[in-house]
């Protein structure tokens, strides 16, 4: 979703620095909590959070806020930010600011992906979010709150889908090319079987319980492979609408860590991945080495 650059720049340049935005920081400046009731009409509050993890809570949203994430030079390297709304998320929309002033919608009022949304900024883009209050006729209590995680992009040469971006709510098998990229770039790569699947209707998520026979990679540590007499059970989450159900055989589970939880990216049967990997390796087209044995 894009907005004219001129409109954004006008809002940022002409808006007043809201007094409410200057207060409300946590001691370490990782989080912010404030209210739109003390914000001057038409103002754009300027916020800056320097930590890799934190939270924002905007009570009675009014006007707009511009939030910069990262250290003193947030444009030094490409970065990936993930936002997870606190439900019910109401009263505002959250956009990622893009080069040229365009805005990309990340969070909106109403139901959405329980796991949140992620955005990737390039090396010349400022890591900034634009929070805009949505108009309402009544004065009911509304809260727009979310947690965020920010990390450096260690493989900026790879396409966005390799970082788990743009797959929120996607329910389709991964192509061979996507499988190979996922094996090289996912936060975790687990060889195991499905022990069971449960469904959380409230969060609109399915929870896959996996017996991890072998952990090929994990960053940060999320799983422990089963030892003799001990099953290494772990949980991986995926959107409910994907209709995941238990199946026989061994799989290669690949995905990303979001707020301490494992979220599924691709889960081919192990033999299916082996076939794709060995074919790519024979043609010298594999993006990285994967220890299958």
Curated annotation (Swiss-Prot):
Belongs to the meteorin family. Its main location: secreted. This is Meteorin. It comes from the Eukaryota. One of its GO terms (biological process) is axonogenesis. Disulfide bonds join 30-51, 82-118, 171-242, 174-266, 184-288. Residues 1-23 form the signal peptide. Involved in both glial cell differentiation and axonal network formation during neurogenesis. Promotes astrocyte differentiation and transforms cerebellar astrocytes into radial glia. Also induces axonal extension in small and intermediate neurons of sensory ganglia by activating nearby satellite glia. Monomer. It is found in: Secreted.
């Amino acid at each position: 979703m894009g907005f004219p650059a001129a409109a954004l720049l006008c809002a940022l340049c002409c808006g007043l620095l809201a007094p409410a935005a200057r207060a409300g920081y946590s001691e370490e400046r990782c989080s912010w909590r404030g209210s739109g009731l003390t914000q001057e009409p038409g103002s754009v509050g300027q916020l800056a959070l320097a930590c890799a993890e934190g939270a924002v809570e905007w009570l009675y949203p009014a006007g707009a806020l511009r939030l910069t994430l990262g250290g003193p030079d947030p444009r030094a390297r490409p970065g990936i930010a993930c936002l997870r709304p606190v439900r019910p998320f109401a009263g505002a929309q959250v956009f990622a600011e893009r080069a040229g002033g365009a805005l990309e919608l990340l969070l909106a009022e109403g139901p959405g992906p329980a796991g949140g949304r992620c955005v990737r900024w390039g090396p010349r883009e400022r890591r900034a979010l634009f929070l805009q209050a949505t108009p309402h006729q009544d004065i009911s209590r509304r809260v727009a709150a979310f947690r965020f995680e920010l990390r450096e992009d260690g493989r900026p040469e790879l396409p966005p889908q390799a970082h788990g971006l743009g797959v929120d709510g996607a329910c389709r098998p991964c192509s061979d090319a996507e499988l190979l990229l996922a094996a090289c770039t996912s936060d975790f790569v687990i060889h195991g079987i499905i022990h069971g699947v449960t469904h959380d209707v409230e969060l609109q998520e399915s929870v896959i319980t996996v017996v991890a026979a072998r952990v090929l990679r994990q960053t940060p540590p999320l799983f422990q492979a089963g030892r003799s007499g001990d099953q290494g059970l772990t949980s991986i989450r995926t959107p409910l609408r994907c209709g995941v159900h238990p199946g026989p055989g061994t799989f290669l589970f690949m995905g990303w860590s979001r707020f301490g939880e494992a979220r599924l990216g691709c889960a081919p049967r192990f033999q299916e991945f082996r076939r794709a990997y060995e074919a790519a390796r024979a043609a010298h087209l594999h993006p990285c080495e994967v220890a299958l044995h």
